[in-house]
Amino acid sequence: MDLNIGRMPHGSRNSIADVSGVRVGHCTVDDERHKTGVTVILPCEDDIFRNKMPAAYHVLNGFGKTAGLMQIGELGTLETPIALTNTLNVGLVHDAMVEYMCRQGERRGYAVSSVNPVVCECNDASLNDIRHRAVGQAEVFAAIAAASADFAQGDVGAGKGMTCHDLKGGIGSSSRLVEIGGETFTVGVLVLTNHGCLHDLTIGGENIGKAIEQRIREDTPDEGSCIMIVGTDLPVTSRQLGRIIRRCSVGLARLGSYIGHGSGEVMVGFSTANRIPAQGDCLNFRCIHESHIDDAFRAVAEATEEAVLRSMLEAHPVTGYTGKVRRSLGEFWQP
């Protein structure tokens, strides 16, 4: 599927997994009452706890319950995989991630006494009986075991019960290639979309949401959240990464989201280029010159816009536990 968003080239997979070492796994819970799940992003194949990554976060609108942001803000590092799930499952998924990291430490010969799992959420209660908290340790471990560079998008994992612009949302991903000083780097974005209202949906400058709205007669406030995970192999500091990930908001705005009161827009980014050992003295890091950062800004904006669209186009129609139906964008629009 070629959406032809922007002007920058994308990677071979056109996903966050174009960043070497990054893998994504899902576990979907899909039965009569539950349309939910968990998605886990593994930033590397080695030990991220003992060799951390530069990281940053940005909250555009803070109506959310994401866990793990405070330490990223203070230390500027990521030390665990990143999990995505529904709002009421954050606690159980966080506990599962702690257990996973403790087991990884034991397997590698060290004890974990403090760890900072990052667990992001959106509220899928319109389709999922969220009170049951159907995602636990077994589902988290299954998602991790299923992690691959080639992963499904749409209504899978954490995206199973999500709604985007009053249509079916979910998991989407895209990437862009950035050339600096003769070297080619990758910026990848993965989104969990659960935001926006149909009336505002705009693609390529055309407000297609109005036409779709006349056919399905549904429009609700812009609320519900969007999680944006940015992975890159650009050699950047935590501060530079923070500047880059803030441009995810451009991609959301180009599709018509105005970031409503009840919507939680959270961005988390990591770079695989520099690793930070758990113990050490003085460290030497390579980072791009600020004069070259504009291309990274454009890359993350384009990749976010495309990732959101992919989350909708790859999703199938889903009927929730109360009978509510979320239609797929693909029923009304194709690139």
Sequence positions of predicted segments:
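Alpha/propeptide regions of enzymes that mature by internal proteolysis
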Residues: 1-335
